[in-house]
């Protein structure tokens, strides 16, 4: 009976997600043991709340990017515009806040609307005009980078600090908040809530089932009378909306936004998604896996920086991990076929 219950538990949470969680714990232990050996600095102690908070700061905005692109990849598509779209949303909304004096709440909503607009654009171009998602998202990436730069006249935009006299710094509490003298990673809490909502959409709704079916066998779904264009467009809209939400958390962490950037976040978001078990060929996706994949990415970045190494090492390790994961996914699919 106990074994049956155990198997049911593993099946419910997903075997791959369970394996990823074990990898996350082992990675943390590895860094905790290795960092004091590699880095003799007295401050190079990985087992501190400060390092955990730093990793969570990165995870909270990267997580929303990865959750969004999970929906697109589930359809068999790709979106390389999410990073620049996040920056574009933060630049436009921040410019309206600091230059034109718009209310902070309205600017936060504007972040989401800008991201959603790019999602609608990408979805319509891919589904109704039949453009390849790779080309479409590359074009949107350039448009987002250019639009943000033109809007701000190529100048960086600085969002208010928490201590700002205007009182507009409260949005930073969305990322971290002081409670009884302790810093709480509220961004991670909100990310988990967002992941639960995304998991419900993907696994418990008609929209999610159609998105996965489109990625698995688009033609069969179309012949069954389903509006594949509409559901696929929805996947891109969700991706854009979540990129807009990610912009809010990004400025909550870094405050200052530079125009013309954001490309590297595309690769990191997609890597977290793929690492979490979402198939690049579509039809298979795991929101829980994506969340853990992002946490692994965050831990990897924080660990490498604490070791005193350049961030480029993270790119090398992440690239190798993605190659292994994609290769394993292709081998698994060939065996099933």
For the regions a protein language model found, what residue spans apply to each?
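Cytosolic-side transmembrane-helix boundaries in multi-pass membrane proteins
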Residues: 1-29, 33, 196, 216, ...
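Membrane-interfacial amphipathic/re-entrant helices at transmembrane-helix boundaries
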Residues: 2-64, 100-106, 337
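Transmembrane helix-bundle core of multi-pass membrane transporters
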Residues: 7, 134-137, 141-204, 231-234, ...
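Hydrophobic core segments of alpha-helical transmembrane domains in multi-pass membrane transport
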Residues: 20-33, 69, 112, 141-146, ...
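Single transmembrane alpha-helix segments in multi-pass membrane proteins
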Residues: 31-32, 48-100, 125-131, 277-287, ...
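Alpha-helical transmembrane segments within multi-pass membrane transporters and channels
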Residues: 101-141, 292-293
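Helix-loop-helix "hairpin" substructures at the membrane interface of multi-pass membrane proteins
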Residues: 102, 107-108, 118-122, 181-256
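Transmembrane alpha-helical segments in multi-pass inner-membrane proteins
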Residues: 236-237, 243, 253-318
């Amino acid at each position: 009976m106990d074994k049956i219950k155990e198997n049911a538990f593993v099946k419910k949470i997903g075997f791959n997600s369970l394996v990823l969680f074990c990898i996350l714990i082992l990675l943390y232990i590895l860094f905790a043991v290795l960092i004091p050996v590699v880095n003799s600095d007295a401050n190079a102690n990985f087992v501190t709340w400060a390092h955990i908070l730093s990793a969570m700061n990165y995870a909270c905005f990267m997580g929303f990017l990865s959750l969004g692109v999970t929906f697109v990849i589930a359809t068999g598509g790709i979106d390389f515009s999410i990073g620049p779209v996040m920056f574009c949303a933060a630049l436009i909304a921040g410019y309206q806040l600091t230059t034109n004096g718009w209310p902070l709440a309205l600017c936060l909503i504007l972040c989401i609307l800008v991201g959603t607009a790019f999602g609608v654009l990408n979805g319509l171009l891919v589904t109704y005009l039949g453009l390849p998602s790779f080309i479409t998202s590359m074009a949107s990436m350039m448009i987002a980078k250019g639009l943000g730069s033109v809007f701000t006249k190529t100048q960086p935009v600085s969002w208010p600090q928490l201590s700002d006299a205007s009182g507009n710094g409260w949005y930073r509490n969305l990322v971290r908040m002081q409670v009884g003298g302790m810093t709480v990673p509220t961004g991670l809490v909100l990310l988990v809530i967002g992941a639960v909502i995304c998991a419900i959409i993907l696994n418990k709704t008609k929209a999610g089932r159609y998105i996965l079916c489109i990625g698995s066998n688009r033609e069969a779904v179309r012949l069954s009378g389903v509006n594949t264009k509409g559901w696929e467009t929805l996947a891109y809209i969700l991706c854009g909306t979540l990129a807009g939400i990610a912009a809010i958390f990004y400025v909550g962490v870094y405050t200052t936004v530079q125009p013309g950037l954001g490309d590297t976040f595309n690769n990191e978001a997609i890597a977290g998604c793929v690492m979490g078990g979402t198939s690049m060929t579509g039809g298979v996706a795991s929101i829980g896996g994506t969340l853990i994949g992002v946490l692994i990415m965050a831990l990897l970045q924080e660990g490498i920086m604490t070791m005193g190494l350049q961030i480029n090492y993270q790119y090398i390790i992440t690239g190798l991990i993605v190659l292994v994961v994609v290769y394993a996914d292709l081998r698994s699919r060939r065996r099933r076929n």
